[in-house]
Amino acid sequence: MERPPGLRPGAGGPWEMRERLGTGGFGNVCLYQHRELDLKIAIKSCRLELSTKNRERWCHEIQIMKKLNHANVVKACDVPEELNFLINDVPLLAMEYCSGGDLRKLLNKPENCCGLKESQILSLLSDIGSGIRYLHENKIIHRDLKPENIVLQDVGGKIMHKIIDLGYAKDVDQGSLCTSFVGTLQYLAPELFENKPYTATVDYWSFGTMVFECIAGYRPFLHHLQPFTWHEKIKKKDPKCIFACEEMTGEVRFSSHLPQPNSLCSLIVEPMENWLQLMLNWDPQQRGGPVDLTLKQPRCFVLMDHILNLKIVHILNMTSAKIISFLLPPDESLHSLQSRIERETGINTGSQELLSEMGISLDPRKPASQCVLDGVRGCDSYMVYLFDKSKTVYEGPFASRSLSDCVNYIVQDSKIQLPIIQLRKVWAEAVHYVSGLKEDYSRLFQGQRAAMLSLLRYNTNLTKMKNTLISASQQLKAKLEFFHKSIQLDLERYSEQMTYGISSEKMLKAWKEMEEKAIHYAEVGVIGYLEDQIMSLHTEIMELQKSPYGRRQGDLMESLEQRAIDLYKQLKHRPSDHSYSDSTEMVKIIVHTVQSQDRVLKELFGHLSKLLGCKQKIIDLLPKVEMALSNIKEADSTVMFMQGKRQKEIWHLLKIACTQSSARSLVGSSLEGVTPQLPPTSAEREHPLSCVVTPQDGETLAQMIEENLNCLGHLSTIIHEANEKQGNNMMSLDWSWLTE
């Protein structure tokens, strides 16, 4: 494996050099990995004999790195003992290893030829802005900010940007002006390029140039020319000018606005242009803006914080396939946001359904800020999906995104010959257009997926209600069976004792009414028709889940995008001399991509309409299930009440029967002091209301029977008379409690 120059064979012990990460003016940065511990560090070593001045600068970088501690500045660490030796008479510099490569590598990807995504731009703005602010607070000017000196690291699934290579950094604690070293020319502030005195505002120019390139895909001022050339043409630009390009006539066109295409949403474009006007001011004294007296920091950092703190909700209108963005003021209610959506889309608030990516409906009780995730920025990172509940048929596809002027020019005449240098710009926009068509489909597919997840949530709720309904129906059925059997038995026993015991027409009528009600409630518990509808919906949903249109269908579009990227790569590798070429192959790809998007969107919206139709069936069915469940619960409650009421009546009858028994005992005790007892008849033994007096033991019972055998006939006569008298008294009792 390759060793960095000067590193002797066998040196490093358990540390093994894995790859060369980069090469600078006189230094190499290599990745070292511990063979046993799986630790990784970046080692910067000198590859040349250094002059005294450069050796001092090398050592100065190490001193600066060791005293810095910030999340967006790469950290220095101790050189492992096995590697701690001099190379070319200077020490090594050990740093944390960032595995994501540098920003230049990201910008060079063909898919980023027209700039990065909004989320990436805002992440870079936040990270590098924070790192620069930290360096300046510590009186350090970097002086060589460029994409090659910004590295990326994955931290818990989030990409962090870190500033590296402080070899040209200047510690200005001895004074505010420096006239020493000149860094990379393309990103260099004008005063450094002209070797004039400078301040920390040189980093503003470099930072602004980098951010502009991340937005547009190229540097702001005549990016195809060498700095010596474009400086002379740009130096007298208006302070608000942030972009300059050369027309076919050779005339330079200036603009205070960002060029198109780019990925920024409309709400961010203006504040970003204002920020770039501060950062790209040619005058170093005006660059960055005045210091805010309250916040005690330059205007550029105040505006940067404002941009990063904007709460913007991005909503994909699934009825039109268009994205609408809203700036959320503090504490705005969801209803207020929906009113703004109505004005923008014409969908009234009552018909709006806003779904998260997980298919969860937004909570109207919570503020509108629930549409924005903490720490997540950019319309490419998080979207809310708008549906019109009054519609179940979506008529897509809709018109494809519009072509830029350049792309439209070659589409109208694909055989027109253009210079290679101009064709690169046109084809870059063509790649951006093809990628945009694929992304438009991906967003709509994500909206369809949110609708599917919402449908499944409704289906889960319906299933729970179905299970509750079936359980309640089964319980009602069991209770009705018990009630029916028990009331039949009670009516039979009541009929048996009527001729010799207690009777009440009111009570008998009430019991028979209960029996009729129970028969009616049995019909309430019949839910088979609802079960059939629910099972039919379950089957329909399963078919929708299995449908190929429920899965991403953009394979052909991805293939076409890759073909466009490959064509663009080939063009970039061609020499930019005076040769010309046409755009026939690129235009074919554009046309095929539009046709492919049209086809997959027809399939997508057809499937989406089925999803929404199925969901509407569930919405229509849920009230019926709720009503059936409510009726069953009401019937259940009524049956239990009737059962309890009848049991109270039976106990009341038992109380009356006991009163009769007590009366018989009193009559018997008045007959010459003798209280003979007769064995109960079979009828009395079986009747639950018979008052049975039980002797204390068997011997006493036998004695009592023997003593009273002689009085049996006389006692029977007395009891018969007492029964007749008591029967007459029953008619005068208060039976009003039966109607309670």
Swiss-Prot record:
Activity-regulation annotation: Activated when phosphorylated and inactivated when dephosphorylated.
Swiss-Prot/TrEMBL keywords: ATP-binding, Cytoplasm, Kinase, Nucleotide-binding, Nucleus, Phosphoprotein, Serine/threonine-protein kinase, Transferase, Ubl conjugation
Positions of modified residues (Phosphothreonine): 23
Ranges for domain Protein kinase: 15-302
Region Leucine-zipper: start-end pairs: 455-476
Example of a GO MF term: IkappaB kinase activity
Subunit and partners: Component of the I-kappa-B-kinase (IKK) core complex consisting of CHUK, IKBKB and IKBKG; probably four alpha/CHUK-beta/IKBKB dimers are associated with four gamma/IKBKG subunits. The IKK core complex seems to associate with regulatory or adapter proteins to form a IKK-signalosome holo-complex. The IKK complex associates with TERF2IP/RAP1, leading to promote IKK-mediated phosphorylation of RELA/p65. Part of a complex composed of NCOA2, NCOA3, CHUK/IKKA, IKBKB, IKBKG and CREBBP. Part of a 70-90 kDa complex at least consisting of CHUK/IKKA, IKBKB, NFKBIA, RELA, ELP1 and MAP3K14.
Xref: PANTHER family: IKB KINASE, INHIBITOR OF NUCLEAR FACTOR KAPPA-B KINASE SUBUNIT ALPHA
Name of the protein described by the UniProt record: Inhibitor of nuclear factor kappa-B kinase subunit alpha
Name of the gene this protein is made from: CHUK
